Regions:
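Alpha/propeptide regions of enzymes that mature by internal proteolysis
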Residues: 1-381
Length: 381
């Protein structure tokens, strides 16, 4: 693996993205959201199941941070192509909410991560689980990192998940080879974890939309940056094209906002993630797991227990659908930028199955040169 001296982001290269980002240009610009990572990188050479090499991890998202009592997190879910997993979505589709952390990892570690999150919730919300009949249905999503990681060795342990959850904080985030995105691949370059945000105004009220992606999708020929067909200018070192000739990856998109939205509205927001990733070129592959979740931190109400007195109902504030165009624009813009942030921050990584290839991090100078050919780069001040 080749390290870079500094973690640049796509905007640092002069790419002229639309929209206004928040302070951190991250999902943590949404007040209350906390993110934690566990990153596992160990070993070199061809895969030996159970021994390594290990290049994987866990990303933990706490939509309302660490609280003594959970509350419903209103949400909507959408699959563009469902060759993947996101647990907890049956209930989200049914009831419109969840109350767990969200974790993202590799495909073969979903069970361990789910197990660990249940334990964390029982400890974190002790009174709820000890004094009432609460049940935990964590949201755990995945993408496949078996080309760079001994995925069948299942190296993510309970302690790694707990570390990511307990380490979750607000503020700026790491990107690229970090957390669940450690071993991921995007457009046959090294990919990983990326984030971005947008600030919008609706009837003079300010709102924030933030996204986090675990980016592991795309074939080189489709790779597009702000409308520029970059992949057509960059055919070399495209490992999947050489080995399989088709896309085999996935992407998880998590959208968080403080906009007051109903679950059915959040599902509509989640659907727009397809347009955001589509702007980077992908048509959505047959073998891809493109799974999206949108949640809001608004309309914070108490989670009723089975043994407590039930409220007659809740009073929710929500945005008029006629104001949604600006929301959709912001979501699409932030997702496009988050994917590119993952790629720009990533570091090159060798493969383990098959061994002997290198997944190159995208070369910043070459990307800038291609963008300049199309007059799609900001002039340096």
């Amino acid at each position: 693996m080749t390290a870079r001296p500094a973690k640049l982001r796509a905007r640092d290269l002069g790419l002229p993205f639309d929209g206004k980002p928040g302070k951190f240009n991250a999902i943590t610009d949404v007040s209350g959201v906390e993110i934690g990572f566990t990153t596992l990188i160990e070993g070199e050479g061809p895969v030996q199941v159970g021994k390594g090499p290990i290049r994987t991890g866990v990303t933990a998202i706490l939509p309302r941070g660490k609280r003594e009592k959970p509350s419903p997190i209103w949400a909507g879910h959408h699959n563009l192509n469902g060759n993947g997993e996101m647990t907890g979505t049956h209930w989200i589709n049914e009831a419109g909410y969840f109350f767990s952390p969200i974790c993202i990892t590799n495909t073969h570690s979903v069970g361990m991560v789910h197990h660990a999150v249940v334990g964390w919730m029982i400890d974190q919300y002790r009174s709820l689980f000890q004094e009432d009949h609460a049940w935990a249905m964590p949201v755990v999503a995945e993408t496949y990192d078996g080309m760079t990681n001994d995925i069948c060795g299942r190296h993510v342990a309970e302690a790694h998940v707990l570390n990511a959850l307990n380490a979750a904080r607000p503020g700026p985030l790491q990107e690229g080879n970090v957390g669940g995105g450690t071993g991921m691949i995007t457009y046959e370059f090294k990919g990983g974890t990326g984030t971005s945000s947008r600030m919008i105004n609706i009837t003079d009220k300010a709102y924030t939309i933030g996204v986090l992606v675990q980016s592991n999708f795309g074939t080189r020929k489709d790779f597009t940056v702000l409308g520029v067909p970059v992949g057509k200018h960059w055919p070399e070192d495209a490992v999947f094209t050489e080995l399989t000739g088709h896309e085999t990856g996935s992407i998880i998109v998590i959208i968080g906002t403080d906009l007051p939205l109903l679950p059915i509205q959040l599902r509509r927001v989640a659907k727009r993630a397809a347009i955001g990733i589509g702007r980077t070129g992908t048509p959505g592959g047959h073998s891809s797991g493109d799974i999206f979740l949108a949640f809001t931190t608004a309309n914070d109400v108490e989670l009723p227990g089975l043994m407590s007195e039930q409220p007659l109902g809740y009073s929710h504030h929500y945005i008029n659908d006629n104001h949604f165009d600006v929301i959709y624009d912001a979501v699409v813009q932030a997702i496009e930028e988050a994917v590119l942030n993952a790629m720009v921050a990533a570091e090159s990584m060798t493969t383990v199955k098959p061994a002997g290839y290198t997944l190159e991090a995208i070369d910043h100078d070459r990307l800038k040169a291609i963008m300049m050919q199309y007059n799609r780069l900001k002039e340096e001040p």
